[in-house]
Amino acid sequence: MPAPPSTLLQSWNRNAQAWIEAIRTGAIESRLTVTDQAILLAVLGRQPERVLDLGCGEGWLLRELEKRAINAVGVDGDATLVEATRAAGSSPVHLATYEELAETTVNIGSHYDLICANFALLHQDIIPLLAAMNALLVPGGALVIQTLHPWTAAAGDYQDGWREERFAGFKGQWQPMPWYFRTLSSWLNALDMAGFQLVNLQEPQHPQSPVPQSLLLVAESRR
């Protein structure tokens, strides 16, 4: 089921309001118990002064960084999410698609100590985007990615390819969303080709769960 980037963005346009409600009401248990804390600790562990939240969604991570006096900037491709983020916090937030970011046709600032993408890299061709993000980092700056753990999400089909999220078990009105599954080696190859070196790999896990809740990658720019 090939899905162009525009189709993925359209699905976010349709699901934005439901997503805002789900995050702000704490409806996603794995985020409350494991993954929100995992990405926050990974970011704070680098002691950054300036952070870009790539695909910031409704802005929860920006607000957490604001509380800690970190200079944080957000960017997202959906106008509803950007508006919600701006209304709920004071961090600057840019409206830009990943294609615009990859082609460097928009200015979202530079000299970031760290760029994070929390469950925000769902399209197929991520290498141009990651390479563009690399150029926005200070020398030796870090990229922190949290994503679905490929060994958990594979569902018996461990190969790169498009999947469909139907939001089963979520409250509210949701439309199915395409997303691109990639294996662990595919993630590592993408980082390497975009000019990054992996320095840390984590598998956040709930103590009562037999499987990891996510995959968390920390990579440094080779510039």
Regions found by a protein language model. Give the residues of each.
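Short alpha-helix
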Residues: 178-201
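A short SAM/SAH-binding and catalytic strip from SAM-dependent methyltransferases
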Residues: 114-127
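Core SAM-dependent methyltransferase catalytic element
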Residues: 209-223
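A short glycine-rich, Lys/Arg-flanked "PGG" loop and its adjoining helix->strand segment in the class I
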Residues: 128-142
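Conserved class I S-adenosyl-L-methionine
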Residues: 1-46, 61, 144-170
